[in-house]
A protein has these predicted regions:
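Residues at or immediately flanking beta-strands
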Residues: 60, 132, 229, 284-287
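Non-catalytic surface loops within mature trypsin-like serine protease
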Residues: 29, 127, 236, 264-266, ...
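ABC transporter nucleotide-binding domain
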Residues: 173-265
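C-terminal coupling/interaction segments
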Residues: 266-310
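ABC transporter nucleotide-binding domains
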Residues: 2-7, 12-208, 214
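Surface-exposed charge patches
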Residues: 100, 118, 241, 276, ...
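A short linear hydrophobic-aromatic micro-motif
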Residues: 124, 248-253, 284-289
Length: 310
């Protein structure tokens, strides 16, 4: 699998403030990378450096083998970019705007029409060519913004908060479009909306205070989200020492006299063992519920944990 983006030891200082601190990662062909972080974490600064709009204080960025500093034109030709606010001209039709963008991308005059048709087709705009951009819904305006980013068939597409301000149906449509783009391009999705990453990406990175604090596949993240604790309530107070004898149990947390949270190793289910203990000892079970971590809990634990160590 070919690597399309290589970022090595990237840092950016603004005076005494370090906005991005020693960030390294890569993006392979066909990957959709979710780039997550709270406001002020360094997401936008990192994206600006990758796009060549901001020079790093130190570090190296290569786009499909081209150094963004040493070979900026060749590197930028491999990129398609949709900023958070799409750079649209509302008084132009979709065809007029995309034709103009094709010229800016340096597409040959004889290939412009074909490129515009391909961009419209990929983004669900085939019947929208004569419509004024000002008269399009926010969802279709986002599609036009994505279309301009892929006209020149770039290796990498960078999307900055592409679903902000959209209604639920439009969000679902843009998510599906992002997944489809991932089949032919590599995509970086910069967002602070956690479900976007779960639904659209194959890998996730979290940046916090300028540092990468997580780089994980969605499969790996899903494993983190599987249950590693059991919430249980008994009719009678149990003998806790019996739970400690269960090999996979790591800790027992008392919530009240009859309710407990039993922590265990990931990948194991202890519910049946706990239920059998309760029956054999006549404790009676009022509640037995595996607790699953959602992505928001994981995000908060990672970012808050990294804050506590600083």
């Amino acid at each position: 699998m070919s690597t399309l983006i290589e970022v090595h030891h990237l840092s950016r200082q603004f005076g005494d403030h370090c906005a991005v601190d020693d960030v390294s990662f890569s993006l392979d062909k066909g990957e959709v990378l979710g780039f997550l972080g709270p406001n002020g974490a360094g997401k936008s600064t990192t994206m600006r450096m990758i796009c060549g709009n901001l020079t790093p204080t130190i570090g190296e960025i290569k786009i499909n083998g081209y150094d963004i500093i040493e070979q900026p034109k060749l590197a930028k030709a491999e990129l398609g970019f949709l900023p958070e606010i799409p750079p649209l001209y509302p008084d132009l039709t979709v065809d007029e705007f995309l034709t103009y963008c094709a010229k800016l991308h340096g597409i040959r005059k004889t290939a412009i029409k074909k490129s515009v048709l391909r961009g419209k087709s990929k983004c669900g705009l085939a019947d929208m060519g004569t419509r004024l951009i000002a008269n399009l819904s926010k969802g279709y305006q986002q599609r036009v913004g994505i279309a301009q980013a892929i006209l020149h068939n770039p290796s990498v597409i960078i999307l900055d908060e592409p679903t902000v301000g959209l209604d639920p149906i439009q969000i679902l449509e843009i998510r599906e479009l992002i997944r489809e783009l991932g089949n032919e391009h590599s995509v970086i999705l910069s967002t602070h909306i956690l479900p976007e990453v779960q639904h659209s990406c194959s890998r996730v990175q979290i940046i916090h205070h300028g540092k990468l604090v997580l780089n994980e596949s969605i499969e790996g993240l899903s494993r983190r989200m599987t249950s590693s604790s059991l919430k249980v309530r008994f009719c009678e107070q149990p003998e806790l020492a019996l739970f400690q004898d269960i090999a996979q149990v790591t800790a027992i947390e008392e919530l009240d006299k009859q309710q407990y949270r039993i922590h265990h190793e990931q990948g194991f289910s202890i519910a049946q063992t706990v239920a059998k203990l309760a029956v054999n000892n006549d404790w009676g079970i009022l509640e037995l519920m595996p607790e699953k971590h959602d992505m928001e809990q994981i995000f908060l634990s990672i970012t808050q944990g990294s804050s506590n160590h600083e």
